């Protein structure tokens, strides 16, 4: 049995985790075991789709790979960021020469921003209860 050539990358953003497999192909997309025409059918919002496939666009590899993505946790926005980082890391496995391009567009950097925890005595992380003088 022939070994299937594939490239793997993991991405995280907020509480979302994406495991991305790139396989040489013609641009098919499979997210969480379900086939999609494009990533836009999964993310719905074109901005999130554009954000997720940006690494493929800047490296001119759009349509050269089939995407198999397992993503869970967070909302669609966080998942989009996680998929983006996963694709970028998988592209590095495919070709190390893409590193300067991906680095230039800051696609290899994990966004460290997380939700700040709620503190007791406050309504939210920083929102204090309304103050009344009388």
From Swiss-Prot:
UniProt cross-references to InterPro entries, sorted A to Z: Ribosomal_Su5_D2-typ_SF, Ribosomal_uS9, Ribosomal_uS9_bac/plastid, Ribosomal_uS9_CS, Ribsml_uS5_D2-typ_fold_subgr
GO CC annotations on file: cytosolic small ribosomal subunit
GO molecular function annotations of the record: RNA binding; structural constituent of ribosome
Compositionally biased region (Basic residues): 120-134
Keyword list, A-Z: Ribonucleoprotein, Ribosomal protein
Chain spans, region Disordered: 113-134
Keyword Cell inner membrane: no
Gene3D superfamilies: 3.30.230.10
Annotated GO biological process: translation
Residues in coiled coil: none
Family: Belongs to the universal ribosomal protein uS9 family.
Entry protein name: Small ribosomal subunit protein uS9
Species: Thermotoga maritima (strain ATCC 43589 / DSM 3109 / JCM 10099 / NBRC 100826 / MSB8)
């Amino acid at each position: 049995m022939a070994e299937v050539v594939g490239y793997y990358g993991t991405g995280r953003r907020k509480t979302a985790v994406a495991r991305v497999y790139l396989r040489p192909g013609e641009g098919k997309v499979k997210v969480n075991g379900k086939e999609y025409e494009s990533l836009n059918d999964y993310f719905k919002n074109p901005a999130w789709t554009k954000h997720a496939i940006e690494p493929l666009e800047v490296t001119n590899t759009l349509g050269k790979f089939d995407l198999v993505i397992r993503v869970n946790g967070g909302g669609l926005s966080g998942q989009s960021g996680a998929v983006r980082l996963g694709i970028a890391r998988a592209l590095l496995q495919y070709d190390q020469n893409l590193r300067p391009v991906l680095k230039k567009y800051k696609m290899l950097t994990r966004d460290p921003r997380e939700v700040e925890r709620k503190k007791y005595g406050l309504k939210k992380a920083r929102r204090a209860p309304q103050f009344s003088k009388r």
